[in-house]
């Protein structure tokens, strides 16, 4: 007897339309909810940020703070009352969303117009740390917020030849107060920086093409990166803060715009230039699903805490998927 065919991938649970522009950034905010469900923030090529209710499946607010320039990154601070948005207008805006407000209360002028998204480390304290692309093409600037005080500039040695930083991930080990930064670079390397010491702890060559995005599971000390090439790289961090490549997963087509591990660390999703969303088991990297709904490049993916997956595309649509729900 032949083995039964696996069931076909599901259709989206629902689709959000109305951005009228390619979608470049997505972020769920559990702290800001409508009818008990998290709000979804989307950033578009036209410079607008839409705030969506998953209950009504409509945009409840539209924010316009980037002068028509593409919004590339979105992040809310703890409690969900403030939003950070990064645009190609060389501005990072801080929005006050408390009690229905939608005003820019501060901004940071960026030095680089590259593709690199910022990253924050905020533990519920009044002060938090922000990593942004720096003045030099290979620099990362570290700021203390909200004072915008410059902490340091992380600049590789001249002979490192890393190229531009393409993606950043600030994090902190549970047993330490020292901030660390994982950065993916144009030459295909992933680098671990000790921010306090302003030094490189470890560097690995993961990809032959620029690293477009990475995510890190601090509990398992294990990360994943995607590039402009045809492979995902899985790597780990040992107790001596040394990075090691653990394996690669070959893809059918090149180009990963974003890779995101679900909050429960069971599965991960990738946004593909080939219009596909790919879902993998995080521990084994077993492929679980290829979701072929969008008609143009998928540029961003995000998970809710309870496992709902959102994907934003160049086709101006945001698809929402319920896959392998959390137990």
Swiss-Prot record:
UniProt WD repeat ranges: 16-54, 58-97, 103-145, 153-195, 200-237, 242-282, 286-323
GO BP: any one term: DNA damage response
Keywords, sorted A to Z: Cytoplasm, DNA damage, Nucleus, Repeat, WD repeat
Gene3D superfamilies reported for this sequence: YVTN repeat-like/Quinoprotein amine dehydrogenase
CC per GO annotation: cytoplasm; nucleus
Segments forming a coiled coil: none
Subcellular location: Cytoplasm; Nucleus
Tissue-specific expression: Ubiquitous. Highly expressed in heart, liver, skeletal muscle, kidney, spleen, thymus and pancreas. Detected at low levels in lung, placenta and brain.
InterPro entries (UniProt xref): WD40/YVTN_repeat-like_dom_sf, WD40_repeat_dom_sf, WD40_rpt
Record function comment: Acts as a critical regulator of DNA damage response (DDR) signaling via specifically regulating phosphatidylinositol 3-kinase-related protein kinase (PIKK) family proteins.
Record-linked PANTHER family: GUANINE NUCLEOTIDE-BINDING PROTEIN SUBUNIT BETA-LIKE PROTEIN 1 (PTHR19854:SF1), TRANSDUCIN BETA-LIKE 3 (PTHR19854)
Protein name: Guanine nucleotide-binding protein subunit beta-like protein 1
Native species: Homo sapiens (Human)
